[in-house]
Amino acid sequence: MSFPNGIYGKYGFEKDTTSSQKHVLGTRMELPDGRVFRYSEIGGADIAAGAVVQAAAGVAHDQDLVVAAASAGDTTVTLSGSLTITKDQYKDGYMHINSGAGRAGQIYRIKSNTAVASATGCVLTLDEEDGLETALTAGSGNTEVGLSVNTYSNVRLQQ
């Protein structure tokens, strides 16, 4: 099975815009002359052709988050801290494990997430068939995770 992260396009494809997602964010497209473009989602106002853009800033309160217990092989992780997160805010982004014996340094791609508003219980669905490599333990001082949006999500004009 193949999972290409690059496509080849014809001249003019770099100008295509869509109102719904057609590729994985960050997909690399190369034109016949060697120019390369990345499939991105624009945040806020329209951006003129040729403008230099940058990734959205990270969300400070979405680091060092406490999780509910999860078993090895699980494909969902529930965050137990009080958060405000919109539905699929972290889609195509990453969950990285900050702490916990034998777990620190692991990273998982996020397939989707539920919305919560100043509440606990945001559920992350991992984009990994085999699920978690090791179990996660609940409670402060045990497993803590951080969330990162996809670099190509909600790009903005460079400041």
What feature does the model see in each segment?
Residues 17, 63-65, 75, 114, ...:
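Short linear motifs in intrinsically disordered/low-complexity regions
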Residues 64-70, 103, 108-117, 127-142:
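N-terminal, intrinsically disordered, small/polar-rich Type III/flagellar export signal
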Residues 74-85, 124-133:
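Short alpha-helix capping/helix-loop boundary micro-motifs
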Residues 1-68, 156-159:
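N-terminal low-complexity, intrinsically disordered "leader/linker" segments enriched in small/polar
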Residues 26-27, 123-159:
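Cys-His-centered catalytic/binding microenvironment captured across papain-like cysteine peptidases
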Residues 42-47, 52-61, 80-122, 145-158:
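Ser/Thr/Gly-rich low-complexity blocks that favor extended beta-strand/coil architectures
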